[in-house]
């Protein structure tokens, strides 16, 4: 059973059908200019973001396609759709978006179009985190195919090494590896891509990216950012905000200055009041604790998801047709808590 089956149903909603990728390959993009490191890299607290996800939870054997986009669209249409959706995220107060990649989406024909989403986001001034998801027919917490994974990252980094707003997360939730195995893989990735400034690399925590301490402690990964995940459904009987805060802090240790909580979320379509008393709701306790902790420790944060069709956790719902798209907020109190976390 998937660790994330709570997130809703696949292929629900109008704008994105389940799709199948088609074969073929594009020439690799020309090598980008050498990476330009900002004089002062932004602190993690400047990452105020949302995930933009495929209705299938980003696990796909074919191309992974964020909600509202289509593999049948060219670059210009993808850019226009993405400009509208990123504009909606900006209106929420976000300045960061996390997007999924997989070998089919990058090594195949969709990449030429998908770059429109990345480019629209960076043109808006957004930081973009590109993270690898394994296929839905694997889901063993391991890289599906080393050669295609390497080729994917070579293509992505050659395209975006020169754009300091693009960040790279080698793998989402590497739960199939021991801590030592995962840090070995991560260290090899960092060394292979040493032309990328380390502050532009997010290394997921151990297991379900749920504990950053082993990664933080590895000297080979010094200077990288750390990606943490935590969800309220992991402890459905916890209704104490303080208990949740302690749980968050136990996963971070003394590594807060490097940590971006790039997945956290709860139900946004069920009418919960995240500003109100906790009562018997583990979700309210969890969201209040998460946002308190983000604010207190100065963590980066990327809500799951800002948009995913058919997901009860989705902060927004996509409206419109064609490239005339907009977002409506599903739960204002949930957004209020994000604004509190983001000091807005």
Task: Briefly describe each language-model feature range.
Residues 106-108, 139, 177, 271:
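Short, function-defining helix-loop hinge/capping sites that tune catalysis or transport
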């Amino acid at each position: 059973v998937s660790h994330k089956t709570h997130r809703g149903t696949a292929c629900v909603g109008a704008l994105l059908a389940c799709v199948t990728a088609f074969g073929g390959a594009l020439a690799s993009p020309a090598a980008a200019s050498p990476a330009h490191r900002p004089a002062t890299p932004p602190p993690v607290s400047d990452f105020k973001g949302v995930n933009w996800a495929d209705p299938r939870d980003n696990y796909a054997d074919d191309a992974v396609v964020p909600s509202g986009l289509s593999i049948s669209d060219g670059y210009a249409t993808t850019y226009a759709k993405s400009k509208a959706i990123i504009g909606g995220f900006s209106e929420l107060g976000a300045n960061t978006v996390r997007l999924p990649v997989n070998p089919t989406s990058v090594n195949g024909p969709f990449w030429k179009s998908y770059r429109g989403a990345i480019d629209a986001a960076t043109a808006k001034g957004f930081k973009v985190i590109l993270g690898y998801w394994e296929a839905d027919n694997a889901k063993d917490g391991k890289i599906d195919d080393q050669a295609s994974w390497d080729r994917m990252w070579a293509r992505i980094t050659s395209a975006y090494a020169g754009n300091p707003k693009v960040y790279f997360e080698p793998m989402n939730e590497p739960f199939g590896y021991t801590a030592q195995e995962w840090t070995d893989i991560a260290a090899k990735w960092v060394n292979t891509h040493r032309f990328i400034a380390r502050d532009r690399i997010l290394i997921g925590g151990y297991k379900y990216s749920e504990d950053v301490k082993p990664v933080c402690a590895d000297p080979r990964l010094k200077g990288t950012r750390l990606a943490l995940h935590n969800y309220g459904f992991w402890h459905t009987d916890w209704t104490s905000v303080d208990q949740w805060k302690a749980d968050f802090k136990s996963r971070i240790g003394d590594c807060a200055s490097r940590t971006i909580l790039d997945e956290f979320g709860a139900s946004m379509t069920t009418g919960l009041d995240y500003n109100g008393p906790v009562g018997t709701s583990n979700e309210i306790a969890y969201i209040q604790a998460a946002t308190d902790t983000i604010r207190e420790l100065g963590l980066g944060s990327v809500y799951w998801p800002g948009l995913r069709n058919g997901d009860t956790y989705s902060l927004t719902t996509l409206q419109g047709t064609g490239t005339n798209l907009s977002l409506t907020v599903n739960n204002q109190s949930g957004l209020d808590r994000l604004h509190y976390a983001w000091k807005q």
